[in-house]
């Protein structure tokens, strides 16, 4: 029983973000479709070869996507919303781009499909749309073409296909409501056709991804798996693939399926591999996801070996990444600015392939010397002073319940804040950032590259802050912001100023489409060596008599949008960040800043996949926010901003944050989101977003007034604020001025009654 290895997928974008550049060039009309397709072919060939050279036995094919793999599956099945279809009914790459981004070099623009988080990762997928009576047919043969490409290059190919039940689970019904699971029998013939085509090509194994099997699914959905896979059996061997959590709760459903193998995530799941082995059919292959596909840390291969060795020789076994390596940067070797010690702690996608090769060889031979050598830096890290800060650990241990309580309840605080700020009814503000012009970005880049000295940089930033204050005063806003000209990214900026973080040069991972992010890496205990935002907030406040908000990114969001440590809990990291930012709140307050906003857009997306695990997460997530904010005096007003499409299921926790004001994204839902706050009888103040900042469209005064009147039917007017949905960083100044002018006018009209 020779053990093989494989990956579940590989990063698509290229080491230098070649795919992103090719996409954006094509969208802008600066290159041809054939040039774009050539870049895709070159990247696929390179990535297969890189994995092979690193020692991978079975190469994933079908993991590449021009925008998103769920969208690729929609096209495969012929699921193209009518508004995005070509007039002749054909499907091409521009069809795909119109669904993903609302426009393409050809065809008519139309509203893009909804985008949402892929399970609990920072990757986004395009939500499939389903209508009653929908027809499906094999339409987009990208998978088959890429399999042909890989076979022509003499690779050992394992196609990757998103499974039918998970595909339906991820979608939404449009128009007349019906049970989307009823479409299962309509999409299965397309899956059968695809598997038949793969069998014709001599494919032995197909990786069929069903990550929905790690969720607490309704019984009807669990029951759907057996008939679905009864219909798919027989043409090729199926590796039923799960990830991001364990499978034990749904194992009875899984073991009844006519598949030939199962992949389990042994990093993020709590499954015991020996117990799994006992419960799986004896002729099934087990693919053990031992190498973390969604973090950047070098694996302790001696530990991984010990985890799996007891079942070696007892069944067919593969070793694998826990999930697709899509969520990891590509290659650590090109990082030249990380010092040797820190660099030795990491493994990016290519290094993870090497780890799988080392693990496979050791399991086949019994010789673990190479594993011990690889794991040595991990042992050294456990005692590094760069990881452990006794002062931080001592402070964390000393936290009491009092540290997460404001001095008085909201009603007492609100009175003190009204006396201090004397704001009018319907107070107007913005969420924080103003347009990041080419001039601002160039200023920051020149300073970062050393082409601009600190004095000239500070003078430039000060000028942009001054301009933002002048613009806001001219518009008549009531509570101002400094505009965040000095910030490149709301998480990276804080990470750069906190001890315990490091940054990469090329650690890009795909977020969606052509958007890539470069998350900070938490390497050790987190502390704040000096004030971060105080200087610019204080300067902005000196320019006006109106209150200027201090702007902080909250602890849970910084955690969720970074690569976290694996040697301590997420709760520990969040509370360390909270303590560091608590000092920032105190310093802002001492500098005369009376309104402080702590953004937590990631609070909801950090929820565990299983609802039964939510309470524990929400408890420490809320506590981290409160530790951050509770140092504020009664007359300091704490704001928070959140952008979710769903509040109902976490309203208790949102109220428990005890922010004086919460601003939320509501314009696209026509204020429907306020239902949650109305039903809950939310006690504090709310700023429902009155226009969508993701659109360049300028809302009319009448439209904003109508939205606010609608809001006032749900929430008492004396507790309502007036603000956009989100920050204005990506907008231009002309539409920003026009939209804010109309927003202020609408508020003034309402004050006059």
UniProtKB/Swiss-Prot annotation:
Residues binding 5-methyltetrahydropteroyltri-L-glutamate: 17-20, 117, 515-516, 561, 605
Q: Name one GO molecular function term.
A: zinc ion binding
Give the cofactor note text. Answer: Binds 1 zinc ion per subunit.
Q: Which GO terms describe its biological process?
A: methionine biosynthetic process; methylation
Write the record's keywords in alphabetical order, separated by commas. Amino-acid biosynthesis, Metal-binding, Methionine biosynthesis, Methyltransferase, Repeat, Transferase, Zinc
Q: Does the keyword Protein transport apply?
A: no
Q: What is its EC number?
A: 2.1.1.14
Q: Which residues does UniProt mark as catalytic?
A: 694
* Residues annotated to bind Zn(2+): 641, 643, 665, 726
List of residues binding L-methionine: 431-433, 484, 599
Q: In which pathway does it act?
A: Amino-acid biosynthesis; L-methionine biosynthesis via de novo pathway; L-methionine from L-homocysteine (MetE route): step 1/1
Q: Which InterPro entries match?
A: Cbl-indep_Met_Synth_N (IPR013215), Cobalamin-indep_Met_synthase (IPR006276), Met_Synth_C/arc (IPR002629), UROD/MetE-like_sf (IPR038071)
Pfam entry (one): Meth_synt_1
What does the record give as cofactor? Answer: Zn(2+)
UniProt KW Membrane keyword:
no
Q: What class of enzyme is it?
A: transferase
Binding sites annotated in the UniProt record for L-homocysteine: 431-433, 484, 599
Which reaction is recorded as catalysed by this protein?
5-methyltetrahydropteroyltri-L-glutamate + L-homocysteine = tetrahydropteroyltri-L-glutamate + L-methionine
Q: Which CDD domains match?
A: CIMS_C_terminal_like, CIMS_N_terminal_like
HAMAP family per the record?
Answer: Meth_synth
Q: Which family does it belong to?
A: Belongs to the vitamin-B12 independent methionine synthase family.
Q: What does this protein do?
A: Catalyzes the transfer of a methyl group from 5-methyltetrahydrofolate to homocysteine resulting in methionine formation.
Task: Supply the name of the protein.
Answer: 5-methyltetrahydropteroyltriglutamate--homocysteine methyltransferase
Gene name in the database record: metE
